């Protein structure tokens, strides 16, 4: 007789599958129609593989194949894998913006975990919002969970030069406007940008969030950088499947891994890799689900003295494929540890500390992962700006900015929203030059709605034709992690709720002082108060559907832009019987 699987405790899936009651036979019997033999319901852990595959999410188009490797690992370790499709918010498809649906996806994931017979979860993610949304949902349930990402695309090349996902889209688009590239050449370049399955091959938001998951300890060491089509990505998926079974046995939960120390490690990692500004709102939101007190002040404090040592676009010149060959994120974590910038005893999903995982790794290419003395910037952390224009903060990515613009005073050229910007920006009669500061309103969490990636406003053609490639830009929007420029983002409070950004007028003088973390509208306190008292909202107001729910309940960018009723951990208690 085959020995029954033994586990140190009764698992929650046995509330559905264990015993001989009518309801158990109902749950168990119907699942058997998929050909599962009776002994699979003997108490072994049921592992939910939460898969964000979708034909509409091309970055995640290969996740079905990876899910099979995860299943193989779960079977090998004595678990029972069941794949569950979950909400997949594609960054390049969803309108008005995938960010508006991050919280909806997190809610759907949370309920999918809590409401079904899972003992542990594998979070199979890739595209930008899929990683934070699944981490948020899993954190709110606090079942053993582990991340495996789909990995980046292979390098792109156009006429012998590297082409970075997104980064060169913005660059080539500006070249067309400046008359330096023909439309035909732009179309030719399109074929070089996405030449394999996977996420953006730059250090955009997808690769940043894969790195954040690894730095938080929520993915196996080395996961972040393996290319999507590399055979080692499949191996990583299979090893992840094996590991989650042991995590269930050990009852190793997200709340034990995603501690304040882990978040500080992730913030410093983001600085070292030149990561996306989007990591700010995502980590704030994830921390809010775990119950960790994380703020913009933590971002500024932890990232201020961390050099950017990863030489990847958009900050540097290489791509994720080279980063993987150089040793990937473990090398970066080791460098942080050697510099005293890592909480070495932070726990990871492996059951080992982060330092035990990375202390012996080797940097195979010091032009890709740079020595500190050759860093792209000596202070690479996301800058948190404050002042009368951003009382609750705004952010800027120094590694992607122009050094000569980090201290700048200029005349405001104001766009009331994205439509106003699009209507005016190509007009040669627009009163603007390279010394001006472009200001866009009503693009925040409530205003857009959803906080779209429109903050990196394209420059006016008449400025581009002068060879000018950057100007100071300020908004309450986000920007793509693949983008670059001296761009002030996430200005809080946003314009749509009557923040000071809402009352900036054409011709106002604005001062940006990055070294002193200052963003100042050069008008008197009395004039600012008068304008704010007279302000009236002029953004769209949805009256029904999810857009209405989102706009009513979304919080500000300074706290992570989560829905107010979703913050915190609600646990994984089994609900009442369904029949």
Swiss-Prot record:
InterPro entries: Dihydro-acid_dehy_C, ILV_EDD_C, ILV_EDD_N, IlvD/EDD_N, Sugar_Degrad_Dehydratases. [2Fe-2S] cluster binds at residues 59, 127, 200. It catalyses: L-arabinonate = 2-dehydro-3-deoxy-L-arabinonate + H2O; D-galactonate = 2-dehydro-3-deoxy-D-galactonate + H2O; D-fuconate = 2-dehydro-3-deoxy-D-fuconate + H2O. This is L-arabinonate dehydratase. Homotetramer. Coiled coil: none annotated. It comes from Rhizobium leguminosarum bv. trifolii (strain WSM2304). Changing residue 436 to S: No change in activity. Does not affect binding of iron-sulfur cluster. Keywords: 2Fe-2S, Arabinose catabolism, Carbohydrate metabolism, Iron, Iron-sulfur, Lyase, Magnesium, Metal-binding. Pathway: Carbohydrate metabolism. One of its GO terms (biological process) is arabinose catabolic process. GO terms for molecular function: 2 iron, 2 sulfur cluster binding; D-fuconate dehydratase activity; galactonate dehydratase activity; L-arabinonate dehydratase activity; metal ion binding. Catalyzes the dehydration of L-arabinonate to 2-dehydro-3-deoxy-L-arabinonate during L-arabinose degradation. Can also dehydrate D-galactonate and D-fuconate with good catalytic efficiency. Has weak activity with D-xylonate and D-gluconate. NCBIfam families: PRK06131.1, PRK13016.1, PRK13017.1. Its cofactor is [2Fe-2S] cluster; Mg(2+). Belongs to the IlvD/Edd family. SUPFAM superfamilies: IlvD/EDD N-terminal domain-like (SSF143975), LeuD/IlvD-like (SSF52016). Changing residue 200 to S: Almost loss of activity. Does not bind iron-sulfur cluster. It is an enzyme of class 4 (lyase). Changing residue 480 to A: Loss of activity. Pfam families: ILV_EDD_C, ILVD_EDD_N. Its EC number is 4.2.1.25, 4.2.1.67, 4.2.1.6. Optimum pH is 8.0. Mg(2+) binds at residues 91, 128, 453.
């Amino acid at each position: 007789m085959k020995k029954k699987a033994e586990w140190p405790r009764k698992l929650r899936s046995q509330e559905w599958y264990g015993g001989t009651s009518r309801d158990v036979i109902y749950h168990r019997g119907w699942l058997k129609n998929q050909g599962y033999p009776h002994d699979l319901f003997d108490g072994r852990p049921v592992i939910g593989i939460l898969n964000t595959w979708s034909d509409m999410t091309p970055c995640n188009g290969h996740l079905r194949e990876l899910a099979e490797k995860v299943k193989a690992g779960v079977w090998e370790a004595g678990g029972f894998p069941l794949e569950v499709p979950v909400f997949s918010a594609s960054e390049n498809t969803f309108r008005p913006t995938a960010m508006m649906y991050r919280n909806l996806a997190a809610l759907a994931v949370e309920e999918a975990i809590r409401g079904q017979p899972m003992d542990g979860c594998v979070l199979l993610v890739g595209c930008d919002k899929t990683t934070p949304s699944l981490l948020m949902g899993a954190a709110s349930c606090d079942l053993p969970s582990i991340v495996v990402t789909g990995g980046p695309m292979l390098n792109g090349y156009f006429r012998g030069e590297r082409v970075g996902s997104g980064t060169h889209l913005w660059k080539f688009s500006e070249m067309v406007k400046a008359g330096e590239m023909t439309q035909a050449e732009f179309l030719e370049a399109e074929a070089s940008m996405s030449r394999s399955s996977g996420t953006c091959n730059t250090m955009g938001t997808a690769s940043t969030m894969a790195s954040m998951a690894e730095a938080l300890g929520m993915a196996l060491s080395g996961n972040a950088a393996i290319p999507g089509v590399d055979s080692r990505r499949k191996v990583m998926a299979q090893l992840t499947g094996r590991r989650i079974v042991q995590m269930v046995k050990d009852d190793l939960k997200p709340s034990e891994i995603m501690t304040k120390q882990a978040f500080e490690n992730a913030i410093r990692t983001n600085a070292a890799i030149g990561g996306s500004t989007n990591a700010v709102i995502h980590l704030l939101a994830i921390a809010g689900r775990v119950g960790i007190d994380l703020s913009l002040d933590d971002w500024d404090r932890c990232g201020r003295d961390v050099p950017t040592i990863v030489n990847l676009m958009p900050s540097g010149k290489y791509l994720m494929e080279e980063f993987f060959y150089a040793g990937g994120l473990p090398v970066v974590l080791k460098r942080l540890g050697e510099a005293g910038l890592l909480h070495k005893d932070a726990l990871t999903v492996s059951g080992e500390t982060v330092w035990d995982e990375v202390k012996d790794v080797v940097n195979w290419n010091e032009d890709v992962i740079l020595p500190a003395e050759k860093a792209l910037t000596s202070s690479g952390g996301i800058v948190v700006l404050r002042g009368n224009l951003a009382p609750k903060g705004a952010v800027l990515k120094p590694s992607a900015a122009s050094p000569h613009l980090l201290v700048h005073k200029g005349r405001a050229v104001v766009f009331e929203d994205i439509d106003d910007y699009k209507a005016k920006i190509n007009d040669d009669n627009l009163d603007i030059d390279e010394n001006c500061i472009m200001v866009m309103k009503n693009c925040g969490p409530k205003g857009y709605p959803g906080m779209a990636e429109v903050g990196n406003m394209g420059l006016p053609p008449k400025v581009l034709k002068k060879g000018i490639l950057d100007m100071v830009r300020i908004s309450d929007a986000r920007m793509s992690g693949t983008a670059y420029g001296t761009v002030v983002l996430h200005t809080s409070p946003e314009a749509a709720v009557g923040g000071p950004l809402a009352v900036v007028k054409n011709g106002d003088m604005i001062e940006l002082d990055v070294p002193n973390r200052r963003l100042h509208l050069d008008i008197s306190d009395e004039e600012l108060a008068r304008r704010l008292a007279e302000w009236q909202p002029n953004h769209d107001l949805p009256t029904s559907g999810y857009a209405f729910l989102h706009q009513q309940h979304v919080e500000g960018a300074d706290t992570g832009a989560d829905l107010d009723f979703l913050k915190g951990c609600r646990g994984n208690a089994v609900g009442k019987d369904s029949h």
